[in-house]
Amino acid sequence: MSGKNLIIQGIEEAQLKSELPEFSAGDTVTVQVKVKEGTRERLQAFQGVVIARRNRGLNSAFTVRKISHGVGVERVFQLHSPLIDSIEVNRRGDVSRAKLYYLRDRSGKSARIKEKIR
């Protein structure tokens, strides 16, 4: 049992991305996603607030929420996915929770997040 676990662990460590920025819930990020349309491949930017982060090694994921034309859009990204080209932190948010699911119910000024001064 333990031997198989070590083999899987070794394979997963080889798949991990190393050049990822530090970010957490409340931060505003821009994620450049590789999108394939027919034979062409292009980058699509998705900018929004990180409302959740799930740290599970290779299975780590984060959820980004933005308001597009008055409609809330959430997208879950796998942190180490080959489809993610880059992640850029635009703004650090000062929040006191790890999961910001309460932002789903809020709109306008009540959905704003204070900026963290470092």
Swiss-Prot record:
GO biological process per UniProt: translation
Family: Belongs to the bacterial ribosomal protein bL19 family.
Pfam families: Ribosomal_L19 (PF01245)
HAMAP family: Ribosomal_bL19
GO terms for cellular component: cytosolic large ribosomal subunit
Species of provenance: Alcanivorax borkumensis (strain ATCC 700651 / DSM 11573 / NCIMB 13689 / SK2)
GO molecular function: structural constituent of ribosome
Protein name: Large ribosomal subunit protein bL19
